[in-house]
């Protein structure tokens, strides 16, 4: 027997939007106000469902908030559903279709009405192959037990889900294995579940899964950006103005290097460096799928960049700075010989001009297509930073974004005078899978997240994106780097 947990703390319209629900999916007529943007905490929300009565004379009842999924015969055989309603009441519902058992934990106010409704329905003549009508159509309908049961439960499912359950659905399995089924498909139907997700939890650990049907995401990706955390959709045109922060949960989504430069640098002050420097194929890397040079060309066309980092000088609230921004969209922000050379030249320029230095890190590590040439960039950049920091006593701030891993973490990512990380950033040297395969040990969930590493003292600050520019400005002035124009400090 498996146990299924439904968390109904979130509001109706999100689930309706995600699953495409605007009316009852299965049987007892439309649901009131499902297309309106209501306050989820309104008292009359409990009225928005039909009872188990007839279609023509429907009434409303608290009993009508049940549980369920589509294709009930395929999904439920011997299950216990754990439900929390929006008042915080929790209760369990046990259902065994084969043995005709339907139980609710004792003492809950839903029990009497819900059980009596269930057994009244179960004992109807057409479920027991009882009396037939003279109408051939009705006879066919009455004899179809699966269709009748499915339809009736589905109507309850629709009512409960639209009024109570959002996308944050937890499945607690009684077995040791994770459930591989997507509840969103059962809840929303095959055609309605695109973009929905579940969070599957067993023995204290949690994994988040999204629908594997990517057609709808691909079709509308020029309009919407899906949050990696809550799977909410964000309108692409306004996402940039919101600093790529998810409107639903505030999660820090990935940003391109150009957007980060625009966010950090004052208008009309950016002067790019070494834009014409491009990668070759120094070790003639062999690939059966795509030659290295062709892959570079492909990413250049896709991103509009020549390499995985942009470097240059500009002003931050009037303070002249040297800035390097890595772009994860270009080959995962991997560090090859060109990336290393551009960053080294930027550091040397900042050293000569006595400028504060910022490098925004977003990288999967050294670029394997360039072999040891990519690895030596770690030493080259670190050597340039040593002269910048130790000899010239200048100020360097790395900003670690998600993800920052591999050779970048092992070199200039962790050499700052003040190290700043973005919230929820994934920061590591080796990835979780590599560690587990190498050491044959399980890596705890969240142990490579910025918040956990901050508690261990790995860096100095976690700064939200909307506060980053002002925090950097304060740090620079604290270290005696002041605006060229004193009026700009007010901005």
UniProtKB/Swiss-Prot annotation:
Q: What is the protein's given name?
A: Acetyl-coenzyme A carboxylase carboxyl transferase subunit beta, chloroplastic
Disordered, as annotated region:
28-56
> Which catalytic reaction applies to this protein?
N(6)-carboxybiotinyl-L-lysyl-[protein] + acetyl-CoA = N(6)-biotinyl-L-lysyl-[protein] + malonyl-CoA
Q: Which Pfam families match?
A: Carboxyl_trans
Its quaternary structure?
Answer: Acetyl-CoA carboxylase is a heterohexamer composed of biotin carboxyl carrier protein, biotin carboxylase and 2 subunits each of ACCase subunit alpha and ACCase plastid-coded subunit beta (accD).
Q: Which residues form the signal peptide?
A: none
Family affiliation: Belongs to the AccD/PCCB family.
Q: Where does Zn(2+) bind?
A: 227, 230, 246, 249
Any one GO CC term of this protein is: chloroplast stroma
Ordered alphabetically, the record's keywords are:
ATP-binding, Chloroplast, Fatty acid biosynthesis, Fatty acid metabolism, Lipid biosynthesis, Lipid metabolism, Metal-binding, Nucleotide-binding, Plastid, Transferase, Zinc, Zinc-finger
PROSITE patterns xrefs: COA_CT_NTER
Question: Its annotated pathway?
Answer: Lipid metabolism; malonyl-CoA biosynthesis; malonyl-CoA from acetyl-CoA: step 1/1
Where does the protein end up?
A: Plastid, Chloroplast stroma
Describe, by residue range, where the zinc fingers (C4-type) fall in the chain. 227-249
Q: Provide the E.C. number(s) assigned to this enzyme.
A: 2.1.3.15
Q: So what does this one do? A: Component of the acetyl coenzyme A carboxylase (ACC) complex. Biotin carboxylase (BC) catalyzes the carboxylation of biotin on its carrier protein (BCCP) and then the CO(2) group is transferred by the transcarboxylase to acetyl-CoA to form malonyl-CoA.
Q: Where primarily located?
A: plastid
Q: Lineage of this protein's species?
A: Eukaryota, Viridiplantae, Streptophyta, Embryophyta, Tracheophyta
């Amino acid at each position: 027997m498996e146990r299924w947990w439904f968390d109904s703390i979130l509001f109706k319209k999100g689930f309706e939007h995600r699953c495409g629900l605007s009316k009852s999916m299965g049987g007892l007529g439309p649901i009131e106000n499902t297309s309106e943007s209501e306050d989820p905490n309104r008292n009359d929300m409990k009225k928005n469902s039909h009872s188990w009565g007839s279609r023509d004379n429907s009434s409303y009842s608290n009993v009508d908030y049940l549980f369920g999924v589509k294709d009930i015969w395929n999904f439920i055989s011997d299950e216990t559903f754990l439900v929390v309603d929006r008042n915080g009441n929790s209760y369990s519902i046990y259902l065994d279709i084969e043995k005709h058992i339907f139980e609710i934990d004792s003492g809950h106010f839903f029990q009497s009405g819900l059980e009596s409704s269930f057994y009244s329905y179960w004992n109807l003549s057409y479920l027991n192959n009882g009396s037939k009508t003279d109408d051939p159509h009705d006879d066919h309908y009455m004899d179809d037990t699966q269709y009748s049961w499915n339809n009736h439960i589905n109507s309850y499912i629709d009512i409960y889900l639209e009024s109570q359950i959002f996308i944050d659905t937890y499945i607690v399995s009684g077995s040791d294995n994770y459930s591989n089924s997507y509840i969103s498909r059962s809840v929303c139907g095959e055609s309605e579940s695109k973009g929905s997700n579940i969070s599957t939890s067993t023995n204290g650990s949690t994994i988040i899964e999204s629908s594997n049907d990517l057609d709808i995401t691909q079709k509308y990706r020029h309009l919407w950006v899906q949050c990696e955390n809550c799977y909410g959709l964000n309108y692409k045109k306004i996402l940039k103005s919101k600093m790529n922060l998810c409107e639903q949960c505030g999660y820090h989504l990935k940003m391109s290097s150009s957007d980060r430069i625009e966010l950090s640098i004052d208008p009309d002050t950016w002067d790019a460096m070494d834009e014409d420097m491009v990668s070759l194929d120094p070790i003639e890397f062999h690939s059966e799928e795509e030659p290295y040079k062709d892959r570079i060309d492909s990413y250049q066309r896709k991103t509009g960049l020549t390499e995985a980092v942009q470097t240059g000088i500009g002003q931050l609230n009037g303070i002249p700075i040297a800035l390097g921004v890595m772009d994860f969209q270009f080959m995962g922000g991997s560090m090859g010989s060109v990336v290393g050379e551009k960053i080294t030249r930027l550091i040397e320029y900042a050293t000569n001009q006595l400028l504060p230095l910022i490098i925004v890190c977003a990288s999967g590590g050294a670029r394997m297509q360039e072999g040891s040439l990519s690895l030596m960039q770690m030493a080259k950049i670190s050597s340039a930073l040593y002269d910048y920091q130790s000899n010239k006593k200048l100020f360097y701030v790395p900003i670690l974004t998600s993800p920052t891993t591999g050779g970048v973490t092992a070199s200039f990512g962790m050499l700052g005078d003040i190290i700043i990380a973005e919230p929820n950033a994934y920061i590591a040297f080796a990835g979780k899978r590599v560690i587990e395969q190498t050491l044959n040990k399980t890596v705890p969930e969240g142990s490579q997240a910025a918040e956990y590493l901050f508690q261990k003292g790995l860096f100095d600050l976690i700064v939200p994106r909307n506060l980053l520019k002002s925090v950097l400005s304060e740090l620079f002035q604290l270290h005696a780097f002041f605006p060229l124009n004193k009026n700009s400090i007010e901005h």
